[in-house]
Amino acid sequence: MPKYRSHTTTHGRNMAGARALWRATGMTDDDFGKPIIAVVNSFTQFVPGHVHLRDLGKLVAEQIEASGGVAKEFNTIAVDDGIAMGHGGMLYSLPSRELIADSVEYMVNAHCADAMVCISNCDKITPGMLMASLRLNIPVIFVSGGPMEAGKTKLSDKIIKLDLVDAMIQGANPNVSDADSEQIERSACPTCGSCSGMFTANSMNCLNEALGLALPGNGSLLATHADRKQLFLDAGKHIVELTKRYYEQDDISALPRSIANKAAFENAMTLDIAMGGSTNTVLHLLAAAQEGDIDFDISDIDRLSRKVPHLCKVAPSTQKYHMEDVHRAGGVVGILGELDRAGLLNREVKNVLGLNLPQTLEAYDVMLTKDEGVKQMYSAGPAGIRTTKAFSQDCRFPSLDTDRQEGCIRTREHAYSQDGGLAVLYGNLSENGSIVKTAGVDKDSLTFRGPAKVYESQDDAVAAILGGKVVAGDVVVIRYEGPKGGPGMQEMLYPTTYLKSMGLGKSCALLTDGRFSGGTSGLSIGHASPEAASGGLIALVQDGDIIDIDIPNRAMKLDVSDAELAARREAELARGDAAWTPKARERQVSYALRAYALLATSADKGAVRDKSKLGG
């Protein structure tokens, strides 16, 4: 029988000092026999997805204590990618994931906590906490802050739905008036919560539900809706049950590595492909798998991407549907139900409730369930009132979206396309793979051939696009923006956004060893591995070189002879210590970022630390 970790600090005469300190936090004699459960919060006033979390840790803690545990809350950092976007702040976004994972490990191991409830929401916070959970392998339940309501405004006598990306595109579009741009800006992000489309934050919260580590409804139920409160209460209750299952019944199925095993990772990736999730999810799933010693790599993603159809299309790939519409159609479980009926899921997986996939679908799939309470939960809708408060409204859709032919979620037979929403491309430009969000690519751009316009920083590319130096037919190449080369693997949302605002969104391609925001759409290929700073061929591309992109055949090639490439490589190596670094880039890189770059792997490994350099 496993021993409660917390007994290390609460039992034995030699721990009198530790107990004295525990007493100073409010613990009593009765508490020293109970499990100590960390409530890992991420409240901050910097991030709309986290601004409402201040009191939600207390809500979970009260439920933990009512259920027989001792709750101890702490906070992690949280970076808002949208606010950090387009300037040097974006260098810190991906590295913050590792700091979050480390901070959770430090706090939980230093204080010998027995289990965790992770209150996450936005882009790097959920992945960082997921990495820590699989690294620590103690009982855990995730409950996120929930999605933002979609923005809505009236333009040209028509009501339109909006999100953050619309504000960015129209703000840079010279054909949009100042008044309309300001109106869109003021309407795009109306409430607290993670940005309203299938961007990285919502994608990861959906994947956590598919991994089995979050409760049904977690990925799609709006942050503002009163129904979401129950998820926090249930998380506090169930984590105590999960903890006792492991420590008192020796049930290892309660541990995250047992729940989020390889079969669950395959299901999560299958969901991601079917819903056209953010390309960042590939990076984060690969990183989490490494932390949990799970045999899941980019070849698995490639294999799955070739057979999974695109069943759910959401902003930024369309403005018709946002997360509130996914929820109305049945949320994550609704998509999983269609994937299961298509024979595309591993059915033996279990979630934190102890339910296997068929049991979960029977209870929570709106197409199957007879539970009116579940149907009511999935009818939770937006109020359209600006607010930063959680659980502040109880509006409902008049009916669920169960139209699987033309609705938000579709059957395999009526899929948006039989090709999934994500694809892995290989070729001499990305020998270890690159990622494209096919859900956001125009059908006429699935094959593309054009001359390269090469830039050694995102800033130079943005200046060229806005300055009219990029024209229709070009392949914009942005290199030395990978995990090492950036460092920090910046998101390229501004270059892709400005291509759209300049009318080039469907007539240009973009290739980078950096990554993309979940808000990116268009022919945008990222994560080129190996990256330029690691000697990848992307470092040898020159202006005017022809690049061939063939998404149906999962291929991408630099059309330059082997002899010429060998000569270019020799010339690069002749630069000595300056080889595989940008030739002309002004960028201040802090020691914190240099430390990250020193250990960072390329994107095909999840941009995690290179463990071979750490020994042990």
Curated annotation (Swiss-Prot):
Pathway recorded for this protein: Amino-acid biosynthesis; L-isoleucine biosynthesis; L-isoleucine from 2-oxobutanoate: step 3/4; Amino-acid biosynthesis; L-valine biosynthesis; L-valine from pyruvate: step 3/4
Disulfide bonds: none
N6-carboxylysine: modified positions: 124
Organism encoding this protein: Yersinia enterocolitica serotype O:8 / biotype 1B (strain NCTC 13174 / 8081)
Sequence positions that bind Mg(2+): 81, 123-124, 491
Domain of life where this protein originates: Bacteria
Name recorded for this polypeptide: Dihydroxy-acid dehydratase
Enzyme class name: lyase
InterPro entries the record matches: Dihydro-acid_dehy_C, DihydroxyA_deHydtase, DiOHA_6PGluconate_deHydtase_CS, ILV_EDD_C, ILV_EDD_N, IlvD/EDD_N
Subunit and partners: Homodimer.
Enzyme Commission code(s) on record: 4.2.1.9
NCBIfam families the record matches: ilvD, PRK12448.1
